[in-house]
């Protein structure tokens, strides 16, 4: 049990920062940070961390902003990606997507839900935790990173290039203030068909690459019942998501066509086996092949960290110490709390899926609003989440000590 006097002091301390926390969120939402351009947003976060007395503030090689606080042996990292998707068609927004609006206690703005909404609570929570002695035994990091275009790349690069490997991670993707403990993985493929171009008036002289892919697309659309299933993570999924065509003109037979396939995988589904599944659909032929995509785009700093687009599934049981600690912190502060999972993918694919680091998710917001013109977060939850981020380290330490 947590001493009631400590809880009262924590709540009073967070309430005293309410206006600062909300203003901080509105300011970082007002700074565009799509297409990995996070520098300006990161600089604003760095200013806030400096004001709060973080011990170290630095940029990693990829261009992610990092703040360190505390000097204990255990390494705890709070992960919040601060890049966002674009706004799409501006005419679909009924308000400025960056300035946003507050209505009935909810902030509507690009990135409010996904996922700048977790940054203020993390940044303030760690500072308050140290001030109150709730961070004793830890070196804690806030990691404001790029995730939208290749989830898991930023943490992978951070660990490899900076040499900092957390013992525990909290992911700030929206969880509705619940404790999330996993999600499905995915693999991204492309299928390339080669044909022969000809003038559309003499199409019989050509070999249409688009037509070659049509039966493959049809077969892919029917294979989902054959895919794996898991009691917690759910059913595997497969979707043809995009198509590109190479053709001399719109009056010519295309000589190349490419489709992209998003394959959501659960436990027991291996990337190589899924590649073979697609190759079996294609059959033995020289003019069509499937391959796993490679991500090798440079970040805004010019940093390149090539990775195959393989994202492992991950999940922890409810009796895992970090899950128990997350639940205990939430129940202490808010009452009964559930565990859950994300439907989409997060940086957990590296932290837990590849590196095996105990990880959970906790944040305000509901993922159904991510990437939409209704991107939103309840401001009360943003403020109250600060209490959780401050209390969690000490609850985790007590849980680990039994």
Predicted segments — roles?
Residues 2-88, 256-260, 274-277, 381:
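N-terminal helical capping/dimerization or prosegment-like subdomains
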Residues 1-5, 9, 190-402:
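Metal-dependent amide/peptide-bond hydrolase catalytic core
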Residues 115-188, 401-402:
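Acidic/histidine-rich catalytic neighborhood of metal-dependent amide-processing enzymes
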Residues 45, 119-129, 155-158, 213-216, ...:
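Buried hydrophobic packing segments
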């Amino acid at each position: 049990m947590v001493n009631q006097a400590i809880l009262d002091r924590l709540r009073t301390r967070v309430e005293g920062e309410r206006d600062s926390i909300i203003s901080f969120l509105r300011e970082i939402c007002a700074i565009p940070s799509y297409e990995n351009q996070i520098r300006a947003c990161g600089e604003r976060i760095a200013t806030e961390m400096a004001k709060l007395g973080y011990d170290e503030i630095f940029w990693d090689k990829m261009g992610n902003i990092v703040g360190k606080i505390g000097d204990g042996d255990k390494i705890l990292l709070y992960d919040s990606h601060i890049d966002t998707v674009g706004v799409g068609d501006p005419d679909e927004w009924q308000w400025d997507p960056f300035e946003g609006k507050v209505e009935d206690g909810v902030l509507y703005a690009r990135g409010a839900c996904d996922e700048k909404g977790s940054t203020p609570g993390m940044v303030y929570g760690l500072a308050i935790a140290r001030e109150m002695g709730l961070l004793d035994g830890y070196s804690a990091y806030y990691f404001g990173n790029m995730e939208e275009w290749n989830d898991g790349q930023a943490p992978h690069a951070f660990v490899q290039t900076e040499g900092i490997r957390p013992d525990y991670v909290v992911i700030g993707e929206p969880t509705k203030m619940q404790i999330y403990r996993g999600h499905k993985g995915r693999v991204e493929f492309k299928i390339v068909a080669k044909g022969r171009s000809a003038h559309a008036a003499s199409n019989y002289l050509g070999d249409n690459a688009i037509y070659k892919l049509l039966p493959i697309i049809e077969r892919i659309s029917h294979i989902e019942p054959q895919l794996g299933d898991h009691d917690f993570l759910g059913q595997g999924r497969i979707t043809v998501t995009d198509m590109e065509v190479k053709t001399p003109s719109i009056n010519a037979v295309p000589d190349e066509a490419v489709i992209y396939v998003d394959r959501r995988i659960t436990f027991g589904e291996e990337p190589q086996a899924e590649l073979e599944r697609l190759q079996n659909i294609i059959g033995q032929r020289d003019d069509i092949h499937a391959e796993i995509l490679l991500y090798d785009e440079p970040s805004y700093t010019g940093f390149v960290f090539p990775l195959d687009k393989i994202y492992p599934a991950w999940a922890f049981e409810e009796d895992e110490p970090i899950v128990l600690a997350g639940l205990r912190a939430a129940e202490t502060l808010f009452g009964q709390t559930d565990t859950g999972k994300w439907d989409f993918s997060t940086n957990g694919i590296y932290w837990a899926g590849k590196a095996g680091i105990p990880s959970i998710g906790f944040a305000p917001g509901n993922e159904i609003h991510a990437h939409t013109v209704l991107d939103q977060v309840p401001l009360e939850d943003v403020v109250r989440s600060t209490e959780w981020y401050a209390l969690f380290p000490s609850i985790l330490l007590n849980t680990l000590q039994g």
